[in-house]
């Protein structure tokens, strides 16, 4: 392995054997495998939820922990993982994360009880937190030219979206044929291929002497964990129960201490200087609302089809396929239209489209024709397929390639917090309503409003500043 100067402040290592002419498709495949595994482990668990409930005799609260426990450690550790990537190198942290995720997936498959599965899912989330921001950083440095990078972001998102779209169907088939354990064993060959390709073909980025804000990260973790406990356990224990009120108090205290610390130290958890730019703030706000809506609705639909409509896991996966397959198709379309329209314009238009489609389902009942549900959710996912790469491109444009590690960590953290809150909120709705139809209707209302708020945020913080910049440049 030899080290070469790649320009600016970074260096890169030439892959083993001195090869530097690695095809773009090979690089994208290597860097997408981590995201594929992380995405699969949300979508396939949603379809397997009812089977896991029956097999391990879990409550709805425990099932929510199985899904959200993964997202909790994922969101909690993303910022710390971004700092580690800066300190010891993105490639090293990416491979570490893949290894942890690989072993945790095996532990999930072997889990004999709900408690053991929850613990393994927590470790899985930690592994995902390590490789997610490093994946974006490695992609940015692998494709330094902006136009090519934008195309590669679209292709990268399409690969991930395809796995997300096929995840419910593949997961349902595997659960029906081999049991719920098989959805975690699926990660083993994917992880092995991804680690081998990354080690062989992806060049390393330069490490930087960075102080890790460990006390701040610990407060961040405590605050998120306490909020998660209150949201997930509240419906079962009661919102005024001692443990729930204590969790809220711990969350508020940890958040207050974190805020005080952030204003007094030179190495804060959040890169607050980046939030001075409206594009960076807008991309992160859109990321939170987008994941709240997308993963909250996916969690709800996986259970709704099985409990309210009597579908098997495989049938539920097939029923979700026409709705989710639009997501990767739209990702590919984004790669073609991104040169004609600004990211802010695309985000605004397609967030509003997704919101309108979701709100059209607030009258859903068990007798609503399947094709009506499929069309509405499918249209929403057309919007989602544009939104995902669009927000990432807007973020990179706002932060600059030199801040890719930390910017990717912030965006992914906000997105996963959105997933965490969205899944927990849908769990609260389904636990608190009198029947599945009522729960689904309220869920679609929340999802639609989240998309619409995201659209307004994209217009105000991304699209309008882009137009002002374009006018200024023209004059």
Swiss-Prot record:
- Gene3D superfamilies xref list: MFS general substrate transporter like domains, Multidrug resistance protein D
Task of the protein: Resistance to the epoxide antibiotic methylenomycin A; probably by mediating its efflux.
* Origin superkingdom: Bacteria
Gene Ontology CC terms, in alphabetical order: membrane; plasma membrane
Any GO MF annotation of the entry:
transmembrane transporter activity
Which InterPro entries does the record associate with it? MFS, MFS_dom, MFS_trans_sf
What subcellular compartments does it reside in?
A: Cell membrane
> What family does the entry list?
Belongs to the major facilitator superfamily.
Q: Kindly state which keywords UniProt assigns to this record, in alphabetical order.
A: Antibiotic resistance, Cell membrane, Membrane, Plasmid, Transmembrane, Transmembrane helix, Transport
What's an example GO BP annotation here? Answer: response to antibiotic
Pfam families reported for this sequence: MFS_1
Transmembrane feature ranges: 28-48, 65-85, 93-113, 123-143, 152-172, 173-193, 212-232, 240-260, 285-305, 314-334, 346-366, 371-391, 416-436, 439-459
- What is the name of this protein? Methylenomycin A resistance protein
What kind of membrane protein is this, topologically? Multi-pass membrane protein
């Amino acid at each position: 392995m030899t080290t070469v100067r790649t320009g600016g402040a970074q260096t890169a290592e030439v892959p083993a054997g001195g090869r530097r002419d690695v095809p773009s498709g090979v690089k994208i495949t290597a860097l997408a495998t981590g995201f594929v595994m992380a995405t699969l482990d949300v979508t396939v668990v949603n379809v397997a939820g009812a089977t896991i409930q029956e097999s391990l005799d879990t409550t709805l609260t425990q099932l929510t922990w199985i899904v959200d426990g993964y997202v909790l450690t994922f969101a909690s550790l993303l910022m710390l993982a971004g700092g580690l990537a800066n300190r010891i190198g993105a490639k090293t942290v990416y491979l570490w994360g893949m290894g942890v995720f690989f072993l945790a997936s095996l532990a999930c498959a072997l889990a004999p009880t709900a408690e053991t599965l929850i613990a393994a899912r927590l470790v899985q989330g930690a592994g995902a937190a390590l490789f997610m921001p490093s994946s974006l950083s490695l992609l940015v440095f692998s494709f330094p030219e902006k136009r090519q990078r934008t195309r590669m972001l679209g292709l990268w998102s399409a690969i991930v979206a395809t796995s997300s779209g096929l995840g419910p169907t593949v997961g349902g088939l595997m659960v029906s044929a081999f049991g719920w354990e098989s959805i975690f064993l699926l990660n083993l060959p994917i992880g092995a291929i991804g680690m081998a390709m990354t080690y062989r073909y992806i060049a390393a980025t330069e490490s930087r002497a960075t102080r890790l804000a460990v006390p701040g990260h610990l407060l961040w973790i405590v605050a998120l964990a306490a909020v998660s406990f209150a949201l997930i356990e509240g419906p079962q224990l009661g919102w005024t129960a001692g443990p729930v009120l204590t969790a809220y108090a711990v969350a508020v205290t940890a958040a207050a201490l974190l805020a005080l610390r952030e204003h007094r130290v030179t190495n804060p958890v959040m890169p607050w200087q980046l939030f001075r730019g409206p594009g960076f703030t807008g991309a992160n706000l859109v990321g939170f609302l987008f994941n709240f809506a997308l993963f909250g609705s996916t969690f709800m639909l996986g259970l709704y089809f099985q409990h309210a409509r009597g579908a098997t896991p495989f049938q539920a996966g097939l029923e979700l396929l026409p709705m989710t397959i639009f997501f990767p198709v739209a990702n590919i379309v984004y790669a073609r239209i991104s040169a004609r329209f600004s990211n802010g314009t695309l985000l605004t238009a397609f967030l509003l489209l997704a919101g309108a489609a979701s709100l059209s389902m607030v009258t859903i009942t068990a007798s609503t024709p399947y094709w009506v549900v499929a069309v509405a959710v499918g249209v929403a996912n057309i919007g989602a397929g544009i939104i995902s790469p669009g927000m990432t491109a807007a973020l990179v444009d706002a932060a600059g390639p030199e801040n890719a590690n930390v910017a990717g960590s912030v965006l992914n953290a906000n997105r996963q917090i959105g997933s965490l809150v969205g899944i927990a909120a849908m769990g609260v709705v389904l636990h608190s309503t009198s029947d599945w139809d009522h729960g689904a209707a309220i869920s679609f209302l929340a999802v639609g409003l989240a998309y619409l708020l995201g659209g307004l945020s994209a217009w105000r913080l991304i699209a309008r500043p882009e137009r002002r910049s374009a006018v200024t440049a023209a004059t």
